[in-house]
């Protein structure tokens, strides 16, 4: 979506904002565990506890649908792939900012059962959820480290032995594509890796959080006009999301049930046991992943998915640097002129999450050291 292509949607956004200056919280989400804090906040009445109204979250099918619904103003609070926020603000000129991280980790590279090594993906196709995704960044790093090159070709096109064809698919389409051998792997958010395991159509080759420690996958993205014109409302939105993250960390099995098709709100089509495998895995599963090599950095003590809201600037800076060296289809010329430090300052508005953290005990409440700086650890 170019800046010109976004204009009609932005016109709709402006019209909606003018017509409804006190709009309630309208969440747009995909049926993935990335959405957990937003859905928990809605289910547990945390927005209402802050004194604001929230409509039932809107389930969308693809990342393209999520960003289009957001740009046009149909929804006003979304979880969005962190690289997509860079593309939206600087490539499509969308007036919106990151206000918090929604979760960390929570993604993996799943491959066909007969694939035992990343190098065996040479000459085959692997699906990604979106060109601007941490999945694409991490996958291409893994491919390079294994002597492979990412390419973008038509499905079925001839590939060299060291080429891996990247295809974009909605997350829900990935397990069927893997089962039918249309692709030989995919890298995506949970629970679609756990789903492949349950269906016995794939195995987890590597967790992304074991490549980039505590990386953000999805972040909370909000319209700039809400942040500027409704700062108190915006603060309450972020308060609710931060409290939802804390609740989820302490009620993982309950969260899996809440999000599942067995839950009262049926937020996702997933079974509780599939979501439980992600949110509340057993110790025996951790040992199995250590043995298989899906987890190589045991000392990182990464959870399959975890939650903490602070958007560390070092992550945004490193993400921008890596996006410049990542194969991305479409008009990506805007990336060349981006300054990582300036983007970290301009793309993110952390005043709301800092206040929200202060009210719940700071970063220590999430098991982190106080202070809003860290160093990025990336080790494929």
PLM regions and their residue ranges:
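Short helix-capping/linker segments at secondary-structure and domain boundaries
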Residues: 6, 45-48, 148-150, 325-335
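Short, glycine-/small- and polar/acidic-enriched structural segments
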Residues: 18-169, 177-180, 184-197, 201-214, ...
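Secondary-structure end/capping motifs
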Residues: 230-338
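Conserved C-terminal helix/tail region of periplasmic/extracytoplasmic solute-binding proteins
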Residues: 316-380
């Amino acid at each position: 979506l170019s800046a010109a292509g976004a204009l009609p949607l932005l016109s709709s956004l402006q019209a909606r904002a003018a017509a409804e200056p006190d709009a309630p919280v309208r969440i747009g989400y995909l049926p993935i565990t990335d959405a957990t804090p937003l859905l928990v906040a809605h289910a547990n009445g945390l927005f209402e506890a802050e004194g604001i109204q929230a409509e039932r979250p809107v389930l969308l099918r693809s990342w393209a649908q999520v960003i289009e619904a957001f740009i046009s103003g149909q929804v006003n609070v979304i979880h969005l792939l962190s690289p997509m926020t860079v593309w939206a603000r600087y490539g499509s000129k969308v007036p919106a900012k990151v206000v918090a991280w929604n979760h960390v980790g929570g993604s993996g590279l799943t491959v066909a059962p007969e694939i035992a090594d990343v190098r065996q993906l040479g000459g085959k196709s692997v699906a990604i959820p979106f060109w601007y995704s941490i999945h694409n960044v991490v996958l291409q790093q893994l491919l390079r480290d294994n002597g492979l090159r990412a390419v973008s070709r038509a499905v079925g096109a001839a590939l060299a032995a060291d080429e891996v064809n990247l295809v974009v698919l909605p997350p829900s389409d990935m397990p069927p594509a893997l089962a039918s051998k249309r692709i030989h792997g995919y890298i995506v958010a949970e629970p679609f890796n756990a789903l492949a395991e349950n269906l016995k159509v794939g195995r987890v080759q590597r967790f992304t959080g074991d490549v980039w420690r505590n990386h953000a996958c999805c972040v909370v993205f909000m319209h700039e006009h809400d942040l500027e014109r409704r700062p108190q409302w915006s603060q309450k939105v972020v308060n609710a999301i931060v409290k939802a993250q804390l609740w989820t960390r302490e009620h993982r099995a309950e969260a899996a049930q809440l999000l599942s098709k067995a839950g009262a709100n049926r937020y996702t089509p997933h079974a509780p046991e599939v979501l439980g495998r992600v949110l509340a895995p057993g110790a025996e599963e951790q040992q199995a992943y250590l043995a298989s090599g899906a987890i190589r950095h045991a000392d990182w003590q990464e959870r399959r998915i975890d939650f903490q809201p602070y958007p560390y600037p070092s992550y945004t800076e490193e993400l921008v640097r890596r996006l410049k060296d990542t194969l991305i289809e479409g008009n990506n010329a805007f990336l060349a002129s981006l300054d990582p430090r300036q983007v970290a300052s301009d793309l993110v508005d952390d005043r709301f999450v800092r206040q929200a953290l202060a009210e719940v005990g700071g970063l220590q409440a999430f098991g982190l050291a106080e202070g809003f700086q860290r160093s990025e650890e990336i080790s494929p």
